A protein has these predicted regions:
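Active-/binding-site microenvironments in catalytic and ligand-binding cores
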Residues: 1-165
Length: 165
């Protein structure tokens, strides 16, 4: 990782929000397609929370792997692109993977897609999102996951995290 000065260029909120996209990619790869859908997100300063669908409680080892994989992707300096597309074109090109459980209103006809490209050029994460994002994962800093909360009755996994420095 680089010195802490590099991270001060971008607001904590932007770094933390961008981290959500990196963590989501890791969650899908570690926990599988059952955790594809985001139910909610939260960011405040250097703290964030990602809530995803999850059919079964993950093991401690799986949570550790999500953190490890997320930080690996940060160190790989993955490129992040925001692309504006018509909703129809975005849905035709990428399907419903661009959406979360909370719907985009039907009157929205143009979407901003945030694409995190993996080191091999494939898509690590893609999502319709109108927030500000970093140009690269290297500016995020280190992700430290906190104790997750599995809500069995709703089949949801809440993953709180902090971004350091």
């Amino acid at each position: 990782m680089s010195s802490g000065l590099e991270y001060q260029v971008f607001p904590d909120e932007v770094r933390t929000h961008t981290a959500l996209h990196v963590i989501k990619g890791a969650v899908i790869r570690v926990l599988g397609e059952g955790s594809l859908w985001t139910a909610s997100t939260y960011t405040s300063g250097k703290h964030g929370r990602l809530t995803v669908t999850c059919p079964v409680k993950p093991s401690n080892e799986q949570i550790e792997e999500i953190e490890k994989l997320s930080n690996k992707k940060i160190s790989e300096d993955l490129r992040i692109v925001s692309k504006t597309m018509s909703r129809a074109e975005a849905e035709k090109t990428y399907g419903n993977i661009i959406y979360d459980l909370f719907p985009v209103p039907p009157e929205v006809k143009e979407l901003i897609l945030v694409i995190v490209y993996d080191i091999d050029g494939s898509i690590w994460n893609i999502n319709a999102c109108n927030k500000t994002h970093l140009p690269s994962t290297r500016f995020i800093g280190e992700i430290k996951l906190e104790k997750p909360r599995f809500r069995a009755s709703k089949k949801l996994l809440e993953i709180p995290f902090n971004v350091n420095p």
